[in-house]
Amino acid sequence: MQYSDYPQMALGHQRYIDYAVRHAHKVAIIDTDFITTQAFCIQYEGKAHPFLDSMIKEYPFDVTILLKNNTKWVDDGLRSLGSKKQRQQFQQLLKKLLDKYKVPYIEIESPSYLDRYNQVKSVVEKVLNDEELEGLQHTKRTLTNEK
């Protein structure tokens, strides 16, 4: 993959996001957002992509659930972030980008898959019931054109 491939990947994500939102019943769960794609771009290409920046601003998410990188690494052949140090650095990059774009997020820190499932389920139930989310790192965001 090359730097020039990231916009095409983002456009593919955009189509899936649009479809999911159109067919969702109140909640659409998106596995990979544009911030994650931007983080991989920075990690692998050494710089952010302006197209991804515009997609992050154009597609604000109500809340992001950030899972801490503290489970066993599974090498899927697509990513090369297997060391503990690399995973921690990538987690910090994700948080930095979430903060930069003022994306509301909740970080789930448990390494237990069952605990993660139950915590995510609780977040989704609160969203469905219009309840306040505890532990939200940002409130709703308002982006202005940054120059």
Which sequence ranges carry the predicted segments?
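C-terminal alpha-helix
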Residues: S122-D130
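Conserved nucleotide-sensing/catalytic segment adjacent to the nucleotide-binding pocket
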Residues: M1-G46
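Catalytic phosphate/metal-binding cores of nucleic-acid and nucleotide-processing enzymes, i.e., regions
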Residues: M1-S4, H25-V27, N129, G135-L143
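Hydrophobic helix-cap positions at the C-terminus of alpha-helices
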Residues: Y16-A20, L97, V127
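Short, amphipathic alpha-helical "lid/cap" segments that border enzyme active or binding sites
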Residues: A10, Y117-K121
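A glycine- and Lys/Arg-enriched "phosphate-lid" helix/loop adjacent to the NTP-binding pocket
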Residues: Y44-D115, L128, G135-T139
